Regions:
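Carbohydrate-associated surface elements
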Residues: 41, 157, 176
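Nucleotide-activated donor-binding/catalytic signature segment of Leloir-type glycosyltransferases, i.e.
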Residues: 244-261, 265
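Short alpha-helical donor nucleotide-sugar binding micro-motif in glycosyltransferases
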Residues: 145, 260, 269-274
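Aromatic "clamp/platform" in nucleotide-sugar-dependent glycosyltransferases that forms part
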Residues: 282
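Membrane-proximal helix-turn-helix segments that form the acceptor-binding/catalytic region
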Residues: 119, 133-150
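Conserved donor-binding/catalytic core segment of Leloir-type glycosyltransferases
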Residues: 194-223
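Short hydrophobic beta-strand element within catalytic cores of glycosyltransferases
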Residues: 299-302
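Conserved acidic donor-binding segment of nucleotide-sugar-dependent glycosyltransferases
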Residues: 257, 314-325, 332-338
Length: 367
């Protein structure tokens, strides 16, 4: 069958969403399906990816303040869909492309939307008080869920806002991790020594530097550890609109900003070379960067407010409250545990999340 994947907020530096779409598309092709990915771009382009996916880039304006994200006009998407004639429609955008479920139903195309974010959490952080945010999110989610045949949530955390409205068409399908690229064997002791700059422990934060990720908590964690006498260095890999503010916050602390790492191999080498990874974002609905760290044999300290509390288990990391002292205490506890045991536990947990399993689940949801 011909599966068309739709997404805005997809670009060269878009992290987890891009990774998920690429692996799912590759898996669909490997399962014998034709796959077309439609995303925003600077100009119109059609290209065949090495995975066998055909990618359409549609002209789209940049969204101010997002660090380069683009959102294509839904009218352009609908015009392309009419030409592509999909057998199944998979949408990875609940906001700017929320009307695509209606298009699919009118045209007799079975449709699925993947919930990559918690709408109630985002509204509460950026726009509205808690109760009002939930009320607005519930109304929007009812309309959205009713317009698609299936809503896919990757975790219980992501599912919670649909449980609250008793949406009947929700399925749980976890995402996966590339266990070949992200592996303990990628550890580079020489590079680790260079990055650590004399510190006893190398801590890494890998991800987009945007407000909802709360990268400042990683910086503050290192401040807590340094004040307690620990010899640590934090390496932040990623870029985004918060970078300048974070650099100011980190002034005088053992923090290095690497910027965006384009190669997945380079990211894998960094994660495997670290002693601990931090994932302080409280709104993560899955957290691929944290899972990639686990696959690399590196334990992770995560926000207990996020979906990552479902993924990280004792021994391979810790889920803690959203303040720096809790993160610092968890880091200390992990560093005090035997390295070989904690690294083996991290890898073992990641091995429970293989992309082929996720692909099978998504294909079952597509029908």
């Amino acid at each position: 069958m011909h599966i068309v994947q739709l997404a805005n907020f997809y670009g060269p530096r878009s992290g987890g969403l891009r990774t998920a779409l690429n692996h799912l598309g590759a898996g669909y092709v490997a399962s014998g399906h034709r796959v077309t990915l439609v995303v925003p771009g600077r100009r119109y382009a059609v290209e065949s990816l090495p995975t066998g996916v055909c990618r359409y880039s549609l002209p789209a304006l940049q969204i101010p303040g997002t660090g380069g994200y683009r959102a294509v006009d839904p009218q352009r998407v609908r015009a392309v869909l009419r030409r592509l004639e999909p057998d199944r429609l998979e949408v990875s955008d609940r906001l700017t492309l929320r009307g695509m479920g209606v298009w699919a139903r009118r045209n007799g195309v079975p449709s699925m939307v993947i919930s990559h974010e918690r709408l109630d959490r985002l509204l509460e952080q950026f726009l509205l008080p808690g109760a009002m945010a939930r009320h607005v999110a519930d109304a929007a989610n009812r309309r959205m869920a009713a317009s698609y045949d299936t809503v896919v949530c990757t975790t219980a955390f992501a599912h919670a806002e649909f449980e609250r409205i008793a949406a009947p068409n929700v399925r749980r399908v976890p995402l996966g991790v590339d266990l070949a690229t992200f592996a303990p064997s990628m550890r580079d002791s020489g590079w680790r020594r260079a990055l650590a700059s004399g510190a006893d422990a190398l801590i890494v934060h890998c991800g987009r530097l945007s407000p909802e990720k709360h990268v400042e908590r990683s910086v503050d964690t290192v401040a807590e550890l340094t004040e307690s006498g620990a010899r640590v260095r934090l390496v932040i890999a990623g870029d985004g609109p918060r970078r300048r503010a974070l650099e100011r916050r980190a002034r005088g602390l053992p923090v290095t900003f690497l910027g965006f790492l384009a190669g997945r191999g380079e990211v894998a080498r960094l994660l495997a070379s670290a002693d601990v990874s931090l994932a302080p974002g409280p709104h993560e609905t899955f957290g691929l960067a944290a899972l990639e760290a686990l696959a690399s044999g590196t334990p992770v300290v995560v926000s207990a407010s996020s979906a990552l509390r479902e993924i990280v288990r004792p021994g391979c990391g810790a889920a803690v409250d959203d303040y720096a002292p809790a993160f610092a205490s968890a880091v200390t506890g992990l560093l005090d545990s035997p390295e070989e045991i904690r690294r083996a536990a991290a890898r073992a947990r990641a091995e429970e999340f293989a992309w082929p399993t996720s692909v099978r689940g998504m294909l079952a949801a597509l029908g």
